[in-house]
Amino acid sequence: MAVNDPNERGIQRILLAEDDDSMRRFLVKALEKAGYEVVSFGNGADAFERLKEEPFTLLLTDIVMPEMDGIELARKASELDPELKIMFITGFAAVALNSEESAARDAKILSKPFHLRDLVAEIERMLAA
């Protein structure tokens, strides 16, 4: 069962999963300033529990996290809501997603460090698609 599409209400909602506290706070502040509603968690397991409760437009997730990594989170999230757009942010530029990773088929990867305007521009491109 797909979760309701938040775009129907015109709300651009981002679910952020990032285990680095300072990076998470920075991203929330910056994305809210850019006009997005952001709900953030420090691990994939908590983020997935929230995703089961309400719809989001985009999942923005680190790859390496405790409890549930970003790839597993993306896989489970896309099973729950196939329309959910997914972007990975990672400090491990060499991380490659296997082609069999169903959640990663249309996902974008942004390597840390990145400039905030690049992140916002990439999010805008994904949400416009």
Protein language model features and the residues they cover:
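Non-catalytic signal-transmission and effector/linker regions of two-component phosphorelay proteins
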Residues: 1-15, 117-129
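Charged docking surfaces used in two-component/phosphorelay signaling
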Residues: 22-33
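Short hydrophobic/Thr-rich beta-strand motif most characteristic of the beta2 strand and flanking loop
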Residues: 35-42, 50
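Receiver (REC) domain active-site loop signature in two-component systems and cognate sites
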Residues: 65
